[in-house]
Amino acid sequence: MLAKRIIPCLDVKDGQVVKGVQFRNHEIIGDIVPLAQRYAQEGADELVFYDITASSDGRVVDKSWVARVAEVIDIPFCVAGGIKSVEDASQILTFGADKISINSPALADPTLITRLADRYGVQCIVVGIDTWYDTESDSYQVYQFTGDEKRTKATTWQTEDWVKEVQLRGAGEIVLNMMNQDGVRNGYDLRQLQQMRAICHVPLIASGGAGTPDHFLEAFRDADVDGALAASVFHKKIINIGELKKYLSEQGVEIRVC
């Protein structure tokens, strides 16, 4: 059995790490490189960086900090933000990222997933899915351009259908960003994770809602996700990664303990 992964998420805007609640009202957390170093030292398995306004601004992620991060950490990291071509991806990977993640650009052009997978291999192609639970229809809907609350909009995709589609097109991993739970710290949406796990045959990463060590445990134990991504609990030092991994190991979760 592969070890489960603990993945801090760093949302980047204007060169700094920020964090919002339900993808809105972002506050500045701090500088990118020191935070990356801290999480690597605490025992994170990998890091994810989202340049959250790149797609809505029509630009590619700023590469200057990608190279700086690569110089100071020795764990894998993934970068997302406005990657719309094989050439964009090539630059990010050349600057030192281990994986690239696409979200809104994949919705605009699903063939991008296949082109990237064919060029670089599925192992480094992640598809991020921003999913919103609509209470009226009791359904999960895919959203795009979520980094800019003025431009955020629903797509025509149901989350379940998009999860199936991106796998067919070559996604090597899926990060499910559950917007209703984002930054609220009341636990991952286990029902949604279980529903998507049943149809997801590539690594599935839970994102949105972590507030306590037990929330991570529930995601691994009850939804069988491959990794759990979180931001505010790590940024604000509510949870220490090393202590979290020790707790999960004691509960029987297969995890790399520092």
Swiss-Prot record:
Keywords: Amino-acid biosynthesis, Cytoplasm, Histidine biosynthesis, Lyase. The active site is at residues 11, 130. This is Imidazole glycerol phosphate synthase subunit HisF. The keyword Lyase applies. One of its GO terms (molecular function) is lyase activity. Coiled coil: none annotated. GO terms for biological process: L-histidine biosynthetic process. Gene3D superfamilies: Aldolase class I. IGPS catalyzes the conversion of PRFAR and glutamine to IGP, AICAR and glutamate. The HisF subunit catalyzes the cyclization activity that produces IGP and AICAR from PRFAR using the ammonia provided by the HisH subunit. It is found in: Cytoplasm. GO terms for cellular component: cytoplasm. It catalyses: 5-[(5-phospho-1-deoxy-D-ribulos-1-ylimino)methylamino]-1-(5-phospho-beta-D-ribosyl)imidazole-4-carboxamide + L-glutamine = D-erythro-1-(imidazol-4-yl)glycerol 3-phosphate + 5-amino-1-(5-phospho-beta-D-ribosyl)imidazole-4-carboxamide + L-glutamate + H(+). Heterodimer of HisH and HisF.
